[in-house]
């Protein structure tokens, strides 16, 4: 009944071909690259309390996410230089850094956007008349069931990783729940991330310590389903 795909089949890293194409463009004389930066937040750090503390949000945003931004920019600059010098071994090593930090950058951008304070609609379920709301009921029977399945996937992550609720355009716009290790992100063009959930310790440990099940349970109070509805239209 449920359309839940195995993470081993759908967790996708950026391809070598894509990375090479990016570096080719970056190395061209006519290409001007703007550096990546942190996204602007739609709420104050403390606005997601008591479910996610302001302290966690501040450190998560200004330290962890900023580090991915810094490392991504630095890795790209180094890769452009290495390509211009024909340093193939260095390019191969930097490709891994670009994939990791690029994934960390993208995943966290999704994370901040799919959060909303309760005062701004956080936790309010999708509209029953929306395409997303209708698809959830059709596939899972209720939003609670989708959340239950997603929490089960989150609990199964060994070490650090992410869970994504995605729209599968290749399968009739069904909803899938997938997980990724570390900072791997969703790159399949047929999969549209609707909700991204950070299962790294830095996302919860200061508040929930080793009881991450409580974090998984409580974060749904500040999930921005309106944003998920918007993404489902893509």
Swiss-Prot record:
Could you say which cofactors this protein requires?
Mn(2+)
Q: Where in the sequence is the transit peptide found?
A: 1-34
Cofactor binding note of this UniProt entry: Binds 1 Mn(2+) ion per subunit.
Read off the SUPFAM superfamilies from this record.
Answer: Fe,Mn superoxide dismutase (SOD), C-terminal domain (SSF54719), Fe,Mn superoxide dismutase (SOD), N-terminal domain (SSF46609)
Which InterPro entries does this entry report, sorted A to Z? Fe/Mn_Superoxide_Dismutase, Mn/Fe_SOD, Mn/Fe_SOD_BS, Mn/Fe_SOD_C, Mn/Fe_SOD_N, Mn/Fe_SOD_N_sf, SOD_C_sf
The entry lists its GO molecular-function terms as: manganese ion binding; superoxide dismutase activity
Q: Provide the binding site for Mn(2+).
A: 60, 108, 198, 202
Which EC class heads this enzyme's classification? oxidoreductase
Q: Which cell locations does it reside in?
A: Mitochondrion matrix
Q: Name one GO cellular component term.
A: mitochondrial matrix
UniProt keyword list = Antioxidant, Manganese, Metal-binding, Mitochondrion, Oxidoreductase, Transit peptide
Swiss-Prot/TrEMBL catalytic activity: 2 superoxide + 2 H(+) = H2O2 + O2
Keyword set includes Ligase: no
Q: Does the keyword Ribosomal protein apply?
A: no
Q: What is its EC number?
A: 1.15.1.1
Lineage: superkingdom: Eukaryota
Purpose = Destroys superoxide anion radicals which are normally produced within the cells and which are toxic to biological systems.
* Record note on quaternary structure: Homotetramer.
Could you say which protein family the record assigns here? Belongs to the iron/manganese superoxide dismutase family.
Tell me what this protein is called. Superoxide dismutase [Mn], mitochondrial
What is the originating organism of this protein?
A: Candida albicans
